[in-house]
Amino acid sequence: MPRMVFRSAALAAVLLLGGQPARSVSAQETPELAPYIMLRSLQFVQDTVALGDHSAGEMQRFMLNKIDSALRAADTSTFDDPRNVDAALIYAMSGGNPATLEYLVERDLSGNFDSRVADALRKYLGGKGTLVAKSLGDMAMEYRDQAIGPYVALVSGNVTDPENPVGALEYYDIARLGAPGTIIEEAALRRSVAIAVDADLVDKGLAYSRKYARRFVHSPYASQFVDFFVQLVVEHHPELSEPDIDATVEFMDVERRREVFLRIARRATLDGKNDLARMASGKAAALAGMAADGPEVLARLYRGVASIPTSEVGTAIEDLAAIPADELSPRDQALRAAAQAIASEVIRKPTTESLAQDAGVKVEARPDAEIEEASPGYEDPGPAVVALPASLESSVEIDPEIQTFVESGRSKLSEIDDLLKQEGVVR
């Protein structure tokens, strides 16, 4: 990691010097670099971050501050060069200070800045982008083959998404195709996956996912992509088959593939998709090896939970009981407790009393089961906790997904008892 920091800093320094090797010069001899040259350093650093060098974040902040100072200090004649105008606009769309763009536009007496673009960006950066969505869309088409084109297209996609998500995909496609291998493509692909998943565009979602996994799996934003991909797989299985999943995760290293399969197994388990849960947990266990480390233990947990509604319930109960509690996170301990409670009801002989009562399944919930980290790399974007019904003696809070799992199991048990009663098995 230190080597990556040095490499990013060194290459950025070379770019700051206009591509010339660094040499000792006095402050008086240091030339003032044009904004467009400085912007190249920022773009390089940001692209390095997107490709997996998380250590370049500090250099990115340094470059933003450096460019901000240079733009404010620049003579108005500097912007007679269209490349410097583009640099100022791209800087503003790359996390720069919006007030600096405002300052430059106010001083522009020569009409170097396209007032339409400047006004639209000021509204966008001021949180009013939806008011200029159509204008930005038109400008994305107009500037698509120019330096600012991919940036304007990305912004257009962002402001179009709330009202017309599928329409935003067109702008994201323009952005990523105009800036391949950059942070622009990373952002456009990631947001395209999210839109495709929410809109049930399975084929597009899978295609975008494979492109992202191939290029940006080491991005600091990749965990968001994994969230979307897991949702896509679980919601559309078996339409999305095992080969479809494998063709996407094959671009990932072993550790990330294992993480993805664990997250698929967990969500599939809680959603009652037991075939998918067993498949994913089996793949995660195979990737983890035979050592009883965290990932292998989690794979056993999810495989056991997924086996409860099957004829292998007895084996599942034994497997769940054999998992050491200290190797599970508090949330996964709560999941195991819920699964064991449901499993015990599955194998319990129904009685007349059980048909008459309406008591809830007793789950020993843990007060610390609201910890966010449920498994390696797992991120739950929803509410962390939800209250148990008042009928439970221990009125604490547990994971809402586990609450749903318990209620689903309780409902299935009730249906089974009703069928037995109708058939006269229970009197």
Q: Where on the chain are the PLM-derived regions?
A:
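Long, repeat-rich segments with strong aromatic
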Residues: E250-T315, A322
